[in-house]
Amino acid sequence: MLRQAGTRLLKVPVCGLRPSITLKRGYAEKAAPTEVPSILEERIRGAYNQAQMMESGRVLSIGDGIARISGLSNVQAEELVEFSSGIKGMALNLEADTVGCVLFGNDRLVREGEVVKRTRHIVDVPVGEALLGRVVDALGNPIDGKGPIKTTERRRVQLKAPGILPRTSVCEPMQTGLKAIDSMVPIGRGQRELIIGDRQTGKTAIALDTILNHKRWNNSSDESKKLYCVYVAVGQKRSTVAQLVQKLEENDSLKYSIIVAATASESAPLQYLAPFSGCAMGEWFRDNGKHGLVVYDDLSKQAVAYRQMSLLLRRPPGREAYPGDVFYLHSRLLERAAKMSPKHGGGSLTALPVIETQGGDVSAYIPTNVISITDGQIFLESELFFKGIRPAINVGLSVSRVGSAAQVKAMKQVAGQIKLFLAQYREVASFAQFGSDLDAGTRATLDRGLRLTELLKQPQYSPLAVEEQVPLIYCGVKGYLDKIPVDRVVEFEHKFIPYLRSSGAEIMEAIRKEGVLSKTTEDSLKAVIKEFLSSF
């Protein structure tokens, strides 16, 4: 046996064997006793020729989920390595004499001096439709007790984002089912829209309602309308993930969803890896001409996990002790969301990253980084949430930079001025509390603003189709709710939608099929609204 620079070469001694006999024999014939030594010699020589070199190293130090290894001189960045205890790790720091490796398991099972061997595989995960309806960990292993995942296709978690030429501009709407978002902050397929806010302001609720809203299209046979969803839970409680899975099952939405869970009890490397794994699973749909949605909930916990790993690997810290490449961490992840051109399959991958702020501070390091990478943000405020305005969207700070090109034309017709009007209303309302003597115009702005705010409220788990949203917003914008008391606006909505389904089915059908509020459809809608208000 030879050993040099961490390389182990196994040699099988060939001794005591007689020279081979060059006698041709058919495979069907029985071997003669004199031929047995030559057959054995050939097989032993063949086994020696097929013997491979196995590169191994030894653990120098272990602690805090980080192992320093010597001997793996040819290991690749982000390659999987396997410890003799069965634990797997990923090589991150490639130094002159040692390799810094993060562990995907309990570091108490690893000992100093333990043998580590290369796998010659960069970290990858299973992909494909077989994962739909399953809950997996950051390495793609099932954790839902439903047995192994039957797929042979695998994909690297770290892949280069599509270039400029394969992409096309965002042009198809991605409906969330929430009136406030679909009207004022529209999202298109292939867009990156950030959901940002303090804890307990309804960030996950928006993402979950978006997944539930697509049941109406995923139950149809039209593949171009379907949206396959990947929900990545990073650093969340296991009970929260279990509730989310249960809610998806109750609403028959788990069948087109994949849950990637790296909960708070998982190690930092798994929390760092989970968003990349979820992205790789979503990319499979994008690259096969389908449409995918990935929710990263949330990226601030991924950044904290990456900071922990980097500091333990002794990488130099920067602002807020994050490493210098934390911007690149998120940009390389979010750039993989794209709308592909028809020449490249026409698929899309939409990203909804979530960032948790501290005390509403959007000027912190990670929030500003992700705001600059994404195509817009939905900003949620604790103050609005506790006032009962849910979803608690701050209209002034929320924006969609590319989604307006993908917005349904009927929605654009009725909701074109609603964002500006609500921003003016909030400004006037802040001054109105100091003075009681208001002119008629200001009073009208306040009254209509109150009703529009009430109209845009929406309970959780009740997404609306666009053909139901358009008539409701039309009522608010055109002043049909001005005579209705503010506390009866919600009652109006609950009664108007069923009435519209029965008496205005052709109006809803026209909006759904044409996507435009034509003159004829608008006249019919006015008649239905007036008829309903006469008996309300």
UniProtKB/Swiss-Prot annotation:
- InterPro entries, per database record: ATP_synth_asu-like_sf, ATP_synth_asu_C, ATP_synth_asu_C_sf, ATP_synth_F1_a_nt-bd_dom, ATP_synth_F1_asu, ATPase_a/bsu_AS, ATPase_F1/V1/A1_a/bsu_N, ATPase_F1/V1/A1_a/bsu_N_sf
Q: Where in or outside the cell is it found?
A: Mitochondrion; Mitochondrion inner membrane
Q: Which PROSITE patterns does the record cross-reference, listed alphabetically?
A: ATPASE_ALPHA_BETA
Q: Where does ATP bind?
A: G197, D198, R199, Q200, T201, G202, K203, T204
Q: Where mainly located?
A: mitochondrion
CDD domains, per database record: ATP-synt_F1_alpha_C, ATP-synt_F1_alpha_N, F1-ATPase_alpha_CD
Organelle targeting sequence: 1-27
Q: Provide GO CC annotations from the record.
A: matrix side of mitochondrial inner membrane; proton-transporting ATP synthase complex
Instruction: Recite the UniProt keywords alphabetically.
Output: ATP synthesis, ATP-binding, CF(1), Hydrogen ion transport, Ion transport, Membrane, Mitochondrion, Mitochondrion inner membrane, Nucleotide-binding, Transit peptide, Transport
GO:BP terms for this protein?
proton motive force-driven ATP synthesis; proton motive force-driven mitochondrial ATP synthesis
Drop me one GO molecular function for this one.
ADP binding
Annotated positions for site Required for activity: S398
Q: How does it assemble?
A: F-type ATPases have 2 components, CF(1) - the catalytic core - and CF(0) - the membrane proton channel. CF(1) has five subunits: alpha(3), beta(3), gamma(1), delta(1), epsilon(1). CF(0) has three main subunits: a, b and c.
Its annotated function is as follows: Mitochondrial membrane ATP synthase (F(1)F(0) ATP synthase or Complex V) produces ATP from ADP in the presence of a proton gradient across the membrane which is generated by electron transport complexes of the respiratory chain. F-type ATPases consist of two structural domains, F(1) - containing the extramembraneous catalytic core, and F(0) - containing the membrane proton channel, linked together by a central stalk and a peripheral stalk. During catalysis, ATP synthesis in the catalytic domain of F(1) is coupled via a rotary mechanism of the central stalk subunits to proton translocation.
State the protein's name: ATP synthase subunit alpha, mitochondrial
Q: Which lineage is the organism of this entry classified under, starting from the top rank?
A: Eukaryota, Fungi, Dikarya, Ascomycota, Taphrinomycotina
